[in-house]
C-alpha cells in the first residue's frame, strides 16, 4: 500500500495488522477534499471575468470593468465559514446520538444540497444561501473526520493518519486551481458553474463509501455496545476477539470510559469551566484553531488570485496554481515527522518559519514603497511560497491532530465541536474583513484600507504569539494512546514537561482499586502496588478473554433463535455464518470485511 511505501512501518511489538484501519482512515480523510475544493474554487471564481459580468450589481473596478463590491465578495466567501461554524456546533449532538459514521453521511447530504443551490444560482443572494448550506455540511465533516480517524487508528500512526485530512484539503485546493485555470477564459456561465458542480462527484462517492465502513470502537463503548465494539476492533486490527492485545486495548477503552462516567454527567459548562485540566484542554484546542487562522493562510487561499492580481503579478491564476502545488507537496514532510519530531516541536518550528517569511515580505514592501515593483513581486512570490511550505508541513495538519487527541472520550465530540467552531468563527471574520484590508476606499466608495503586502505584519505578529503559546500550553501527545493522554493531563502540570511523560498506570488498574472521589487517580496507591507476576497477568487476560467470549455467545444466542430449525447436516456451519452476519449487523448494517 502507498502509505507503507512512503516509509511507515508497524512496530514489531504491535500485534495484528494495521492495514484495515489505515485504509479506512485514508478514505474518510478525503472528506477534506470538500473543504479544500470549495475554498479553492471561490478563490478563482471571484477573479473570473464571466462571473463578475453575471453577478456585478453596478460596481466598477479600478480598470473600468464591472466588478463585485467588497461587501458582496466578503459575504460570498465568509458565509461558507458562517455555515461551517454552525455545522461544527451541530456535530457534537449528531455524532453522539447517531454515531460518527451516520452523521458524516448526513453531513455530506447537506453539503450536496448547498452545492446544487450554488450551481443553480442566478444572483448573489442565492449563491450566498448555497454556500451557507454547504458550509453547515463541511462544518460537521471538519469535526467528525478527525474524530473518527483518531478513535479508530492505532496509536503508532494516529498522528500521521489524522494529518491526511489536511493533505486531502490541500489536494482539494490544488484540484480547484487546476479546474479554474481550465475554465476561467470561458465567456459563459460554465466558467464558474463547472468548477462548482464538479464537487458533487466526490461528495457522492464519499457518501456511498461511508455506508460500508465501520463505526469506531470507542463510540460503540460509549453507547454501551461492548460486543459490537469488540467485533469492530477485531476487524480494524485483524485480530481474533480473544487475542490478548485486542482484549487489553478494548478493556482499557472501557475502563477509561467507566472512569469518566464516574465523574458524573458532562455539559458544555463543565467542559469550559469544570475540572481545571479539562478547561485547560478546551482553551488549548480553541486557541490552536484560532491561531491556525491567524497565521493568515486563508488570506492566500480565499483571495490569493485577487491579491496577486492587485499587486501587479503577471498571470495570477498560474501563480495561485503554483502555490497550491507547493501547499499539497509540503504537507507530505509533516506526515513523516509528526510522530518522530512530535507535535510541539513541529508546531514551534512551523510558526517561527512562517513569522520570518511574513515579516520579510512586509518589511521589503514598506521599504520599497511604490518603487521597483518587479523586485517586490519576486520577493512576494518567493517568501509566500516558503511561508506556505512551513504552514503545510506544520500548522495545517498538526492542529487537527492535537485537537482530535487531547479530549476525554465522554466529551470528545462536544469539545471538538467547540474548538472547531472557534476556527470557523475566526475564519468568517478573516474572510469577511480581508476585502476591506485590500481595497482602495476611493475606488470602492466604502470604508476600507489598502494595506497591500503590509498585511503580512499582522500575520507575522500572530505567528510569534503562536510560538509562545505552543511552548506554554500544548502537551506532547505522540506515541501514547488516547487513554494515556488523559493520564498525562492528570499528572503533568506544565506542557514543557510533557515530553518526559511515561505512563505508570492504566484505567483498568484504577477500576480494580476503585475510582477516588472527584475522579482523581489514586496514583500513590497504584505506585505502591507490587507488579503482578507474569502468571497473574496471564490469568487476568484469560479471564477477560473468557468474559468476552461469554458476552459474544450470549449476543449470538439472542440473535440466532430463528436459525434453530436448520438441519443437522448443514445447520452448524450455516448458523455460525448467520450469527456472524447478525453480529456485524449490530454495528449498523455495515460491511466490515477487508
Swiss-Prot record:
Keyword Membrane assigned: yes
Keywords, sorted A to Z: Glycoprotein, Membrane, Sugar transport, Transmembrane, Transmembrane helix, Transport
GO molecular function, one term: carbohydrate:proton symporter activity
Region (Disordered): 512-594
Main location per the UniProt record: membrane
Recorded superkingdom: Eukaryota
Localization per Swiss-Prot or TrEMBL: Membrane
GO biological process, one term: carbohydrate transport
Transmembrane segments: 14-34, 74-94, 104-124, 126-146, 160-180, 194-214, 294-314, 319-339, 346-366, 379-403, 416-436, 455-475
Keyword Transmembrane: yes
Extracellular side: 35-73, 125, 181-193, 315-318, 367-378, 437-454
Record PANTHER family: MAJOR FACILITATOR SUPERFAMILY (MFS) PROFILE DOMAIN-CONTAINING PROTEIN (PTHR48022:SF40), PLASTIDIC GLUCOSE TRANSPORTER 4 (PTHR48022)
NCBIfam families documented for this protein: SP
Function comment: Probable glucose transporter. Involved in sugar transport, carbon catabolite repression, and initiation of conidiophore development.
Protein's name according to its UniProt entry: Probable glucose transporter rco-3
Organism: Neurospora crassa (strain ATCC 24698 / 74-OR23-1A / CBS 708.71 / DSM 1257 / FGSC 987)
Lineage: Eukaryota, Fungi, Dikarya, Ascomycota, Pezizomycotina
Encoding gene, per UniProt annotation: rco-3
Amino acid at each position: 500500500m502507498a502509505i507503507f511505501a512512503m516509509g511507515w512501518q508497524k512496530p514489531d511489538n504491535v500485534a495484528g495488522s494495521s492495514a484495515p484501519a489505515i485504509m479506512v482512515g485514508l478514505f474518510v480523510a478525503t472528506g477534506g477534499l470538500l473543504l479544500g475544493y470549495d475554498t479553492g474554487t471561490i478563490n478563482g471564481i471571484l477573479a473570473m471575468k464571466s462571473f463578475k459580468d453575471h453577478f456585478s450589481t453596478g460596481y466598477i473596478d479600478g480598470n473600468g470593468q464591472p466588478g463585485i463590491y467588497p461587501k458582496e465578495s466578503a459575504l460570498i466567501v465568509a458565509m461558507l465559514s458562517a455555515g461551517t461554524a454552525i455545522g461544527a456546533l451541530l456535530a457534537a449532538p449528531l455524532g453522539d446520538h447517531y454515531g460518527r459514521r451516520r452523521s458524516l453521511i448526513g453531513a455530506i447530504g447537506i453539503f450536496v444540497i448547498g452545492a446544487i443551490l450554488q450551481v443553480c444560482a442566478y444572483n448573489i443572494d442565492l449563491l450566498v444561501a448555497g454556500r451557507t448550506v454547504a458550509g453547515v455540511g463541511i462544518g460537521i465533516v471538519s469535526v467528525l473526520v478527525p474524530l473518527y480517524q483518531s478513535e479508530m487508528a492505532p496509536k503508532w500512526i494516529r498522528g500521521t493518519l489524522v494529518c491526511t485530512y489536511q493533505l486531502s484539503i490541500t489536494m482539494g485546493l490544488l484540484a480547484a486551481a487546476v479546474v479554474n485555470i481550465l475554465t476561467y477564459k470561458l465567456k459563459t456561465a460554465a466558467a464558474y458553474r463547472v468548477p462548482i458542480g464538479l464537487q458533487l462527484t466526490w461528495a457522492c462517492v464519499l457518501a456511498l463509501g461511508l455506508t460500508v465502513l465501520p463505526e469506531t470502537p470507542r463510540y460503540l463503548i460509549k453507547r454501551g455496545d461492548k460486543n459490537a465494539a469488540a467485533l469492530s476492533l477485531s476487524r480494524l486490527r485483524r485480530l481474533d476477539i480473544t487475542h490478548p492485545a485486542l482484549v487489553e486495548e478494548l478493556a482499557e477503552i472501557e475502563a477509561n470510559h467507566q472512569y469518566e462516567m464516574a465523574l458524573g454527567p458532562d455539559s458544555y459548562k463543565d467542559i469550559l469551566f469544570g475540572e481545571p485540566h479539562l478547561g485547560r484542554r478546551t482553551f488549548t484546542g480553541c486557541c490552536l484553531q484560532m491561531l491556525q487562522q491567524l497565521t493568515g493562510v486563508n488570506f492566500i487561499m480565499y483571495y490569493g488570485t485577487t491579491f496577486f492580481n492587485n499587486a501587479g503579478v503577471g498571470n495570477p491564476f498560474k501563480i495561485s496554481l503554483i502555490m497550491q502545488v507547493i501547499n499539497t507537496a509540503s504537507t507530505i514532510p509533516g506526515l513523516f515527522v509528526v510522530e518522530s519530531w512530535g507535535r510541539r516541536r513541529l508546531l514551534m518550528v512551523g510558526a517561527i518559519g512562517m513569522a520570518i517569511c511574513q515579516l520579510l515580505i512586509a518589511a521589503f514592501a514598506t521599504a520599497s514603497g511604490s518603487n521597483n515593483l518587479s523586485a517586490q513581486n519576486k520577493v512576494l512570490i518567493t517568501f509566500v511560497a516558503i511561508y506556505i511550505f512551513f504552514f503545510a508541513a506544520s500548522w495545517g495538519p498538526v492542529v487537527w491532530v492535537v485537537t482530535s487527541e487531547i479530549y476525554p472520550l465522554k466529551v470528545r465530540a462536544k469539545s471538538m465541536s467547540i474548538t472547531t467552531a472557534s476556527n470557523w468563527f475566526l475564519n468568517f471574520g478573516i474572510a469577511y474583513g480581508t476585502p476591506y484590508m485590500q481595497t482602495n476606499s476611493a475606488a470602492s466608495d466604502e470604508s476600507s484600507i489598502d494595506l497591500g503586502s503590509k498585511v503580512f505584519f499582522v500575520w507575522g505578529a500572530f505567528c510569534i504569539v503562536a510560538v509562545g503559546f505552543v511552548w506554554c500550553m500544548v502537551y506532547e501527545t505522540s506515541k501514547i494512546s488516547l487513554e494515556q493522554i488523559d493520564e498525562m493531563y492528570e499528572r503533568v502540570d506544565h506542557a514543557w514537561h510533557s515530553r518526559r511523560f511515561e505512563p505508570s498506570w492504566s484505567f483498568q488498574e484504577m477500576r480494580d482499586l476503585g475510582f477516588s472521589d472527584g475522579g482523581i487517580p489514586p496514583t500513590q496507591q497504584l505506585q505502591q502496588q507490587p507488579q503482578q507476576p507474569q502468571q497473574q497477568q496471564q490469568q487476568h487476560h484469560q479471564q477477560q478473554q473468557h468474559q468476552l467470549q461469554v458476552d459474544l455467545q450470549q449476543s449470538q444466542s439472542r440473535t440466532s433463535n430463528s436459525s434453530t430449525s436448520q438441519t443437522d447436516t448443514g445447520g452448524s456451519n450455516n448458523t455460525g455464518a448467520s450469527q456472524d452476519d447478525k453480529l456485524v449487523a449490530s454495528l449498523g448494517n455495515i460491511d466490515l470485511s477487508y
